[in-house]
Amino acid sequence: MTQTRGDRNIAWIETHARIPEGKFVGQPVRLSLFQKKVIRGIYDSPTRRAIISFGRKNAKTTLAAFLLLLHLCGPEARPNSQLFSAGQSREQASILFSLAAKVVRMSPDLNAYVTVRDTAKQLHCGELGTLYRALSAEASTAYGLSPVFTV
């Protein structure tokens, strides 16, 4: 049986990512059935845009960090692509960056390929030339950007 794009991405997350915070910090990720359904809904459909909305304290930002890493250095990565997250303030913009950076640092697999640039709020995969940046509305204009993934 052929593995779907969604199932491939679920397997990649569960193989390479680690839980960044909380009681099980550092342990391999085991996505919930709901998270798997969200991932399949995004990647097993022809859509290019997905809006994820669910209640507070349901790991939305953590799931977004996993999706970001899929596009930075995982099976969804395209060479020399740009990825962004945006927030109203610098602090808000850095939340996703901080979680994704923790996942990278805790995973020997990801840490070998991804460089974390804390002061610039960037993740860079040198092998693929992919770059993620956290942007805020406080920053100057974002003209000239052509992202393949945006949160």
Give the label of every model feature segment.
Residues 1-151:
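Phosphate/NTP-binding elements of NTP-utilizing enzymes
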